[in-house]
Amino acid sequence: MPFFEEMEIGRRREIGSYTFTAESIKTFAAKFDPQRFHLDEEEGKNSLFGGLAASGWHVGSACMSLLVADGQRLAREAAERGEEVAVWGPSPGFRDLRWIRPVLAGDTVSYANVVIDKRTSASRPGWGILTARTTGTNQRGEEVYAITASAFVPLRVKGA
């Protein structure tokens, strides 16, 4: 993972894609969001969604899973090159979470993020706070998900 100083505003990353199957939608919903339009095709079809729809939390969880996997891959590649690996901290929060369009069974959502802000932390010496806008786009090119989230990122040069 990159250090704070290496992150540039405007940097865009393709994070990965996830296909929402009827089975994965129902399994997630049964555990975490058991509403009828997430659990039953007919109920979904008769709802405002027009089909079996993934929970918005499922759409966000798929994004988080891909973000973590991408970060692990970046860290592994940096370590293989003999580079120091930045271990990112937690997220202090998010804003502007939007479920823009329904994600239906069979949809594939591709996620990407863009760094929109960065600043050094006033309360945590040695850390910066990076803010990125992450979006999810379905196979038809329609944006279906968006969130603006921040993360603590270590500074390479402590005290900067």
Language-model segments: which ranges?
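HotDog/MaoC-like acyl-thioester-processing domains
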Residues: 1-14, 99-160
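Hot-dog-fold acyl-thioester-processing enzymes
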Residues: 1-92, 156-160
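Conserved interaction-surface patches within small, structured recognition/assembly domains
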Residues: 95-97
